[in-house]
Amino acid sequence: MPITRAEKEAIIQELKEKFKEARVAVLADYRGLNVAEATRLRRRLREAGCEFKVAKNTLTGLAARQAGLEGLDPYLEGPIAIAFGVDPVAPAKVLSDFIRETRKMEIKAGVLEGTIIDARRVRDLADLPPREVLLARVLGGMQAPLYGFAGALQGTLRKFIYALEAIRKQKAGEA
């Protein structure tokens, strides 16, 4: 049964909002997935805080253009599903892991904070550690010089105190 114009407009509006709200969207060809595998993928994406949508390519293209994304049309061929996420790494990582496991899907492209990226860049994104790990590494890199500086000051202060103590003992011995 064909969908009505109102239903199409609702789908376009929903996809447009998702393209605008999500920091990342990954487009994948889901050809060959059976229902059980699709359900498993949706569950994994949901656990990672992502959403998985399937819509007609023409509606997806219209929604992308309305959201200000030009140039997505060449990737909208064949059965395409979109994984939306707030964490820039999560959808790419979940899809890449799932593809390695099942060998049934193919990443076509992605949208990262309003910029269209190709499949290679999406795979590179999937190889990044999660945001929290990256922040911890940056913070650790910033703290290391401070700890070194504090240690150097502590050592200098300790030597100064030992010198004062030696002078005090020497003066006490002379008196």
From Swiss-Prot:
What UniProt keywords apply to this chain's record, in alphabetical order? Answer: Ribonucleoprotein, Ribosomal protein, RNA-binding, rRNA-binding
Q: Record the organism.
A: Pelotomaculum thermopropionicum (strain DSM 13744 / JCM 10971 / SI)
- Entry keyword annotation includes Ribonucleoprotein: yes
Q: Give the family per the record.
A: Belongs to the universal ribosomal protein uL10 family.
Q: Which InterPro entries match?
A: Ribosomal_uL10, Ribosomal_uL10-like_sf, Ribosomal_uL10_bac, Ribosomal_uL10_bac_type, Ribosomal_uL10_CS_bac
Question: Could you tell me what this protein is called?
Answer: Large ribosomal subunit protein uL10
Q: Which PANTHER family match?
A: 39S RIBOSOMAL PROTEIN L10, MITOCHONDRIAL (PTHR11560)
Q: Name one GO molecular function term.
A: large ribosomal subunit rRNA binding
> What Pfam families does the annotation carry?
Ribosomal_L10
Q: What does this protein do?
A: Forms part of the ribosomal stalk, playing a central role in the interaction of the ribosome with GTP-bound translation factors.
One Gene Ontology cellular component annotation held by this UniProt entry: large ribosomal subunit
Describe, as the record does, how this protein assembles with itself and its partners.
Part of the ribosomal stalk of the 50S ribosomal subunit. The N-terminus interacts with L11 and the large rRNA to form the base of the stalk. The C-terminus forms an elongated spine to which L12 dimers bind in a sequential fashion forming a multimeric L10(L12)X complex.
SUPFAM superfamilies hit by this protein: Ribosomal protein L10-like
BP-aspect Gene Ontology terms:
translation
